[in-house]
Amino acid sequence: MATKRAHPEDETHESKRAAQETQLLPYNGSGFLMQVENDGALRKFTPINAMRAQQNLSWQCLVLLNCQALDFSAINFHYGDLQYLKDKFTELQNLSNYYEWRKQERPEDKVCIMEAAVGKCTYTIGLRVKGRPNGFAIAEFGSVHRSKSTFGQFLSTTWSAIHEHNSVFGKIMDSYYKHEYPLKLESSVCVHLPEKDYEREIKARQFLWVRRDNNPELYATGQLDRPLEVAPMTLAEFDRLFEVNKTDGPSQEVPVLVCGRIDGVKYGKEIQMTDVNGRKFSEKPYSLAFKPVLYLILEP
């Protein structure tokens, strides 16, 4: 049987229909562009002023974007007692950029996993290099507070995008180990807080104040046209801010811009649970293996 030949007008009509489905259309004066797909069954909306909004970002967001690009030139460290920041910046710059990695096609295909060694509790996850997997640098707005457990005091850090990061690394673990149940990571990460003053002072110097008094032009104009002037936190300021001598309950939440590294996923001590049928079982809590490198405290 002869095959029916497509009419040129049919081909033209089909190409026009496809073009109409994929073009962006202003929708009803709403400030959005509408993209129609799947014969009109799927409609995607994108803000028209997305690019305009980027041009009007606050100076705080511009600092964040600089840090996410691993460009720390927006922080003035070129004098005296701030030279140690250069080593902090280099540590972050030697890691893989998380945000650039996520833009790649099939980014998970480029990572490798190193299982936890005997006596350790971290599955190392990172881009494949000649050596150990190379972890990821991130920068996010978040908060930190001091808390206490049977193992001593610790700093608990969280950030708005931690749920996205948990999902990414949880899926990597799921695809590798194929557990019966999906992996659920904790919504904060904890770092031990030492008791000795000299050790806690090292921790305090990870916190940098960005104050109005040191950046008058920035706060007056809202324009980031020069590097931030920062001041490292003293031990006395650290202990006061995080209420180290408080005997019960956590300290207040401190808003921060945190820069750090994700080196994989770690697990804690097993916890006992019971299902709805009364069967007892144990599971280990999992969280991101996250190491904070710097905290910026931006005075409002």
Curated annotation (Swiss-Prot):
Compositional bias annotation for Basic and acidic residues: 1-19
Q: Where is this region: Disordered?
A: 1-20
* Protein name according to UniProt: Uncharacterized 34.6 kDa protein
Q: Which organism is it from?
A: Orgyia pseudotsugata multicapsid polyhedrosis virus (OpMNPV)
